[in-house]
Regions:
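Short, low-complexity, intrinsically disordered N-terminal peptides in bacterial proteins
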Residues: 1-4, 181
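A short beta-loop-alpha structural element at the N-terminal edge
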Residues: 4-18, 30
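Structured loop/turn residues at secondary-structure junctions
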Residues: 8-11, 70, 143
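Acetyl-CoA-dependent GNAT
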Residues: 18, 22-110, 121-123, 127, ...
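Residue-level preference for beta-strand/loop junctions
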Residues: 59, 98-99, 132, 170-172
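Conserved glycine-rich acetyl-CoA-binding loop
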Residues: 104, 108-122, 130-131, 142-149, ...
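C-terminal "cap" of GNAT-fold acetyltransferases
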Residues: 134-137, 141-148, 152-181
Length: 181
């Protein structure tokens, strides 16, 4: 099937919300996302509007890329954030280089293994490189082997940075990085 790979538009917040809620109900969601379905469901529409606008086409600090089926249905998404040197990231670590940070990766189960995730990642990486990122990173749960295998196949390597999970004592996430080609 042919999909349109594109940046989300600011007015598509309801579709972005629906796909995120679907992602948070996936069986691997506890390993893939810090946010729970219940937390996301309780957020007001204004949250989803702002979140979508901040990652929409034309935004400088973030970009959400979607895969849209011919019938208009969204079947996958990925967001990349730009982190500037001299700032602190979400986990409290200093950001030393301009970098992209991939978050919110989701492809519907029936599309997994089809190559769609590769295409979404290519678009996200292209955007990050075009916005001056020196490297792109992502954080993956230590027990999420499937995701780790995909990220390695995409060229990402473990950096050695381990992030303890505050919500799950005794569990950690691992940073994977891809240097700019």
């Amino acid at each position: 099937m042919n999909y349109v790979i594109r940046s989300v538009r600011a007015d598509e917040w309801a579709a972005a919300k629906a796909l995120r809620l679907e992602a948070l109900q996936d069986p691997v969601a506890p390993l893939a996302y810090l946010e729970t379905y219940e937390e996301a469901l309780g957020r007001p529409d204004s949250f989803w509007q702002e979140r979508t606008t901040s990652g929409a086409a034309g935004a400088d600090g973030a970009q959400t890329v979607i895969a849209e089926a011919p019938d208009g249905q969204w079947v996958g998404m990925v967001t990349v954030l730009i982190e500037e040197p001299g700032t602190t990231d979400w986990a409290g670590f200093p950001v030393e280089r301009k970098q992209g940070h991939v978050v919110g990766v989701f492809v519907r189960p029936e599309e997994r293994g089809s190559g769609l995730t590769d295409v979404l990642f290519d678009a996200a990486l292209e955007w990050a490189w075009a916005h001056g990122a020196e490297r792109v990173r992502l954080i993956v749960h230590e027990d999420n082997g499937r995701a780790q295998r995909f990220y390695r196949k995409a060229g990402f390597e473990p950096s050695g940075v381990v992030v303890p999970l505050a919500k799950a004592p005794g569990q950690s996430e691992l940073e994977f990085v891809l240097e700019r080609p």
